[in-house]
C-alpha cells in the first residue's frame, strides 16, 4: 500500500466508484439485526447499514488511488450549482462557448455545459440519475436548460468531443458539433449489486446514448430504423405518476 498527500484544491479525475458499508468506529458495536417496528400489521426489518462511497481518482501527476467520496467537492461553476435542485453535481463538462458582450461575468466567452447529477446519497448502484445540458441565453444573459434525461441509472465517464452525425444527410449533420455520450443501465439488465468485498459496481447490459448540441438544440444520434432501447429507471414510472397525482390534489 502507498499513500499520497494531496493539497486542498488539487484537481482530480474520477475514474471508478465503489461502495461499502461504513466502518463502525472503534469502541462501538454494530447495531443488532432487530425488527425496527411494525406498520399496518407488517414487521419491518432492520434498516440497511450506512454506506460509504470511494472513488478511484487520478491526480495531475498521473498517480491513482482510492479516496473517500465525502471529502471531495465537484469542481462545478456556482452558476450551475444554483440550478441543481437539491441534487449533487457529479460532473460538469464544457461542450462549447458562446460570446456574450453583455454577460455579467468578466469572461465574455461563456461556457455551455453537460452535467451529470445524482442524489446526495452514498451506496447507490449508479453514478448519476440525470443528465442536463445548460446553454447560455445571450438575450437574457443567463443559463437555461436545453436538455434533460432523468430517472436513469447512469455511469461515468461522460465523453465529450466534436463529431459529425454519421447517419444524417443534411449539411448540418455533416458539420462537426459538440457531441456527448454516456451509458445507462438497460431495462432488461439484472439488478446491480455491489461486490460485497471490494464494493465494485459493475453494471450488466448498458445502453450508449449519444447526443449533439446543434445551436441551442440537443438531438440524439441514432441509426435510422433502429428501435430505441429501453432504459432502467431507479424510480418506477408508475410511482412517479402516483406522486404527481398526489401533488395535484
Model features per residue range: what roles?
Residues 1-8, 13-15, 19, 26-107, ...:
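Boundary regions of SH3-family modules and the immediately adjacent low-complexity/disordered segments
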Residues 38, 43-46, 80, 135-249:
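Acidic, small-residue rich beta-repeat scaffolds with periodic aromatic anchors
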Residues 91-110, 170-185:
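A short, charged
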Residues 114-115:
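Amphipathic alpha-helices and adjacent low-complexity segments
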Amino acid at each position: 500500500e502507498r499513500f499520497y498527500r494531496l493539497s486542498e484544491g488539487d484537481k482530480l479525475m474520477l475514474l471508478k466508484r465503489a461502495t461499502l458499508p461504513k466502518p463502525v468506529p472503534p469502541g462501538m458495536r454494530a447495531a443488532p439485526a432487530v425488527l425496527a417496528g411494525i406498520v399496518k400489521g407488517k414487521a419491518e426489518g432492520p434498516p440497511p447499514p450506512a454506506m460509504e462511497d470511494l472513488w478511484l481518482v487520478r491526480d495531475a501527476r498521473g498517480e491513482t488511488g482510492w479516496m473517500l467520496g465525502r471529502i471531495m467537492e465537484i469542481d462545478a461553476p456556482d452558476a450551475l450549482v444554483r440550478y441543481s435542485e437539491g441534487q449533487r453535481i457529479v460532473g460538469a463538462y464544457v461542450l462549447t462557448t458562446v460570446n456574450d458582450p453583455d454577460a455579467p461575468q468578466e469572461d465574455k466567452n461563456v461556457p455551455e455545459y453537460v452535467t451529470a447529477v445524482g442524489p446526495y446519497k452514498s451506496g447507490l448502484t449508479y453514478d448519476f440519475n440525470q443528465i442536463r445540458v445548460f446553454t447560455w441565453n445571450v438575450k437574457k444573459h443567463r443559463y437555461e436548460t436545453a436538455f434533460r434525461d432523468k430517472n436513469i441509472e447512469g455511469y461515468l465517464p461522460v465523453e465529450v468531443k466534436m463529431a459529425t452525425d454519421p447517419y444524417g444527410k443534411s449539411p448540418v449533420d455533416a458539420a462537426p458539433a459538440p457531441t456527448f455520450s454516456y451509458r445507462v443501465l438497460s431495462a432488461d439488465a439484472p439488478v446491480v449489486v455491489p461486490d460485497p468485498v471490494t464494493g465494485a459496481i459493475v453494471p450488466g447490459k448498458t445502453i450508449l446514448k449519444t447526443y449533439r448540441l446543434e445551436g441551442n438544440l440537443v438531438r440524439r444520434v441514432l441509426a435510422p430504423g433502429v428501435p430505441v432501447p429501453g432504459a432502467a429507471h431507479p424510480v418506477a414510472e408508475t410511482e412517479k405518476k402516483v406522486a404527481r397525482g398526489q401533488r395535484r390534489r
